[in-house]
Amino acid sequence: MNTRKVSVVVLIGLLALLVLAACGGGSGASTQAPTSGKTFSVETTEFAYSPNMFNASVGQPVSFKITNKGTVDHTFVIMGLDGKEAVKATIKTGGTETLQFTPAAAGNYPIVCDLPGHKEAGMQATLTVK
């Protein structure tokens, strides 16, 4: 009789584990589609961004796919409205990086290469948010 009770308890335990596994705790990842936004393709050279003017809406995610066509490394820094760095990507010579930003307020967000002398040489752009 003890063997039968143990078998029943083990069977119930296995069934409970199976049910819990099927319901699963999951990874915590959302199954919702991400909020769509704009994606801009940008090329860097010495010493420019092309294009150098971008438009977006408040709260709209923006992605920049930045390809360095130049002969030296560059950065793509979006400055906040407070004048401080909001987000930054470093793009190696011949490389491509993707930078994401969601503007929280309307205004003109400066974009610069913060490597010495690059901004001063004209490596600047603007993200206009309405």
Feature locations, PLM:
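Generic structural detector for well-ordered beta-strands
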Residues: S41-E43, N55, K65, T90, ...
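Beta-strand signatures of extracellular beta-sandwich domains
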Residues: T75-M79
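N-terminal edge beta-strand
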Residues: A33-G59
